[in-house]
């Protein structure tokens, strides 16, 4: 429908639902990037699963042996047998990059967060041009951006590069556009060559 009718859409996704694993989240991110590829405006929201006390969802989460912590953000999902912490961290970094790419100027003609309008879709165009040139999936290219950002943001000691990526959701909502400039994204994508790709 988004593509067919050129709709403005707000889409909410929760990362770490009971029973969800790395492959499930990867497939969802891949699908959503294709879904918002052609829209004129959208907000692709990502939230980390919260184990709120007294909720039915928390009871279901317990059946899946899910672990939550309020160390950084309230009742935040940390890990489960289906999604070990290492896999969750991979999901968080991928999600942060997808959020940064798709929710700010340069992807669609209307920035849903600020309501700004622009004809600038250079990030979207660069992303898909690079994806096609390198014959990658959306998430394979996102993984290349994650690797680049781990190096690029190291000097500023961004939350993104810290081993446990604390405050991940806060980072993608409030810090990603300031720490990851459009110019860096476009240059990084433009400089990727097939022989440089990390496994």
Model-inferred region functions:
Residues 78, 85-199:
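Radical SAM enzyme core and accessory elements
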């Amino acid at each position: 429908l988004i593509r067919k009718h050129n709709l403005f859409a707000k889409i909410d996704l929760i990362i770490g639902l009971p029973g969800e694993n790395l492959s499930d989240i990867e497939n969802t991110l891949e699908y959503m990037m294709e879904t918002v590829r052609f829209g004129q405006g959208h907000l692709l929201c990502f939230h980390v699963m919260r184990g709120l006390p007294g909720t039915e969802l928390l009871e279901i989460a317990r059946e899946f042996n899910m672990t939550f912590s309020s160390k950084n953000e309230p009742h935040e999902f940390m890990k489960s047998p289906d999604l070990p912490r290492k896999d969750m961290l991979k999901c968080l970094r991928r999600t942060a990059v997808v959020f940064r790419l798709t929710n700010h100027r340069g992807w669609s003609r209307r920035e849903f967060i600020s309501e700004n309008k622009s004809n600038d879709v250079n990030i979207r165009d660069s992303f898909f041009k690079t994806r096609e040139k390198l014959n990658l999936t959306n998430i394979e290219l996102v993984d290349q951006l994650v690797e680049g950002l781990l190096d690029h943001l190291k000097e500023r000691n961004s939350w993104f590069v810290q081993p446990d990526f604390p405050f991940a959701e806060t980072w993608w909502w409030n810090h990603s556009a300031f720490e990851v400039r459009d110019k860096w994204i476009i240059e990084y994508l433009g400089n990727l060559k097939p022989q440089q790709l990390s496994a």
